[in-house]
């Protein structure tokens, strides 16, 4: 007897905790959030057969420090994502835990015109993808910082 995959059921649960605070009229503040995701399906790395799972689920966290006053906005964000199953099957792939530091600075000249610069992955964190074991390295992406400089005009 066979059952189509699209008739299976699972339950995914999640919680998000978030805090934000500004320090009076100084323009300084912070944001922090933590997202917890869990499902009732576990992937058994010891089985060499097809398993039904929901890939891509993992906990995440972000910590942001910012300044926002008189048209100047500065934002630094530390982002974290826990290890997650990227693809299942006989040869599963796991994306390892990952941190990334980003920044964004912008200045609003008026309601229509603003300038910005942003940096993504400032600390040049690498990304590792492994198979059933962390010793089975499948992909290694060298992390490079990326920068954007731009102008926004609304009319």
Where are these regions (language model features)?
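Gram-negative outer-membrane beta-barrel transporters
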Residues: 2-88, 123
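Residue-level "hotspot" positions that anchor or transmit function at local structural transition points
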Residues: 7-9, 53, 93, 97, ...
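Residues that define the transmembrane beta-barrel architecture of outer-membrane proteins
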Residues: 11-13, 57-61, 97-101, 143-147
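Surface-exposed coil/turn segments at beta-strand junctions on protein surfaces, enriched
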Residues: 23, 56, 67, 94-96, ...
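Residue-level detection of beta-strand scaffold positions
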Residues: 28, 34-36, 66-69, 73, ...
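Feature captures outer-membrane beta-barrel proteins of Gram-negative bacteria and organelles
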Residues: 59-70, 101-105, 136-138, 149-151
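C-terminal beta-signal and adjacent terminal beta-strands/loops
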Residues: 80-85, 106-155
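Short, surface-exposed loop/helix-turn segments at secondary-structure junctions
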Residues: 88-94, 132
């Amino acid at each position: 007897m066979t059952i189509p995959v699209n008739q299976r059921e699972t339950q995914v649960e999640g919680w998000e905790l978030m805090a934000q605070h500004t320090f009076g009229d100084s323009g300084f503040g912070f944001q922090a959030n933590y997202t917890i995701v869990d499902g009732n399906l576990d992937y058994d790395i010891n089985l060499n057969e097809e398993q039904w799972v929901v890939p891509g689920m993992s906990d995440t966290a972000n910590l942001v420090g910012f300044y926002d006053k008189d048209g100047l906005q500065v934002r630094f964000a530390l982002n974290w994502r826990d290890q997650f199953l990227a693809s299942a099957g006989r040869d599963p792939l796991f994306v390892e835990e990952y941190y990334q530091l980003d920044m964004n600075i912008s200045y609003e000249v008026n309601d229509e015109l603003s300038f910005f610069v942003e940096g993504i992955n400032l600390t040049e964190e690498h990304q590792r993808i492994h198979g059933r074991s962390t010793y089975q390295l499948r992909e290694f992406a060298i992390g490079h910082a990326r920068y954007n400089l731009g102008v926004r005009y609304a009319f």
